């Protein structure tokens, strides 16, 4: 009996609107914000707020923000994800597909494409270095839901996190050093991670522990003093308390502490997207300079950098 399995890789990320238009953004946000992993409020209370207030108000505003970062080929998140797919497939010499937790292509789309190529063992790599139920947990839910719809369930290897993987830390450090070499070194390196409600962490989500560990390992790799680097959390919405310190408040306060030249990196994001290109690169710079800062350097995500592709390949082949 031939037990040789054909292996493939499914890269999972959050997803993106298909167009930078209010209707497309509304469809995407509706699916995203309906997930109880993301917003755990009681449905009968949350759904009227979501559909009656949030989606009608936020969708046009967010669409305009997307328009400022939209690339010729499409959404930055999708453009860079496809580049990762191509590069990783070439490196591993095996089928690699993309599946988004929300929007298209879905996780089911990715599984179907892999199985159509004869794959019967799938390594699922959610591109969230630090585990959170709101991201990696939601990706696992999407995978489980997708597998309910396939006739033959493939063997699955699921990579939960890689926040402390040596090649991930080295890839981050390389991107920082490249920025220093090209633009100069700032007084301080700010590591901005996507936030989650503080209540989620209080209830056991290990995300902030992973974020803090990533920052510490990056500090050691770069040889920085603890006074030269810090962790903050961005992208909060609503009135609930989220993980602190907040990125936006920190950017406003650093110049008064004597930090006039700042480098900012977003380690939780594997590809550049609205939250990095608009919120951090554009809004963040405006806030820092307005508060008295003089130099602001945004360090892009790892995207399809060779060191990032090498790390992804190692994660897959280690399993």
UniProtKB/Swiss-Prot annotation:
Molecular function in Gene Ontology: ferrochelatase activity; metal ion binding
Reaction(s) the record says it catalyses: heme b + 2 H(+) = protoporphyrin IX + Fe(2+)
Top-tier EC class: lyase
Chief localisation class: cytoplasm
GO cellular component, one term: cytoplasm
Coiled coil: none
Metabolic or biological pathway: Porphyrin-containing compound metabolism; protoheme biosynthesis; protoheme from protoporphyrin-IX: step 1/1
Subcellular location: Cytoplasm
InterPro entries with a match to the protein in the record: Ferrochelatase (IPR001015), Ferrochelatase_AS (IPR019772), Ferrochelatase_C (IPR033644), Ferrochelatase_N (IPR033659)
EC code(s) of this entry: 4.98.1.1
Gene Ontology biological-process entries: heme biosynthetic process
UniProt cross-references to PROSITE patterns, sorted A to Z: FERROCHELATASE (PS00534)
Top-level lineage group: Bacteria
Binding site for Fe cation: 194, 275
UniProt KW keywords: Cytoplasm, Heme biosynthesis, Iron, Lyase, Metal-binding, Porphyrin biosynthesis
Functional summary from the UniProt entry: Catalyzes the ferrous insertion into protoporphyrin IX.
Family of this protein: Belongs to the ferrochelatase family.
NCBIfam families: hemH
Protein name: Ferrochelatase
Source organism of the structure: Vibrio vulnificus (strain YJ016)
Gene name in the database record: hemH
């Amino acid at each position: 009996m031939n037990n040789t399995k054909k292996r493939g890789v499914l890269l999972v990320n959050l997803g993106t609107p298909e167009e930078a238009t209010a209707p497309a953004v509304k469809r995407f946000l509706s699916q995203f914000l309906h997930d109880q992993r993301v917003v755990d409020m009681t449905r009968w209370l949350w759904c009227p707020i979501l559909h009656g207030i949030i989606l009608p108000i936020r969708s046009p505003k967010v669409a305009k923000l997307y328009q400022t970062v939209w690339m010729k080929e499409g959404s930055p998140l999708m453009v860079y994800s496809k580049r990762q797919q191509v590069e990783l497939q070439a490196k591993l010499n095996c089928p690699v597909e993309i599946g988004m937790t929300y929007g298209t292509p879905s996780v089911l789309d990715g599984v179907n494409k892999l199985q159509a190529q004869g794959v019967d063992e799938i390594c699922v790599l959610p591109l969230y270095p630090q585990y959170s139920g709101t991201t990696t947990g939601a990706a696992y839910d999407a995978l489980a839901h997708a597998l309910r719809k396939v006739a033959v369930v493939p063997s699955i290897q699921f990579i939960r996190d890689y926040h402390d993987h040596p090649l991930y830390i080295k890839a981050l450090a390389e991107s920082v050093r490249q920025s220093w070499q090209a633009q100069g070194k700032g007084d301080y390196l700010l590591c901005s991670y996507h936030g989650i409600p503080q209540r989620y962490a209080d209830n056991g989500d290990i995300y902030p522990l992973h974020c803090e560990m990533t920052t510490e390992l990056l500090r050691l790799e770069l040889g920085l003093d603890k006074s030269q680097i810090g962790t903050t959390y961005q992208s909060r919405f609503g009135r609930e308390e989220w993980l602190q310190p907040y990125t936006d408040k920190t950017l406003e306060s650093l110049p008064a502490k004597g930090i006039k030249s700042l480098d900012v990196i977003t380690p939780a994001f594997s590809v550049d997207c609205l939250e990095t290109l608009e919120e951090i690169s554009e809004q963040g710079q405006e806030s820092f300079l307005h508060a008295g800062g003089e130099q602001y350097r945004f360090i892009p995500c790892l995207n399809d950098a060779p060191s990032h592709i090498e790390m992804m390949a190692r994660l897959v082949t280690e399993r």
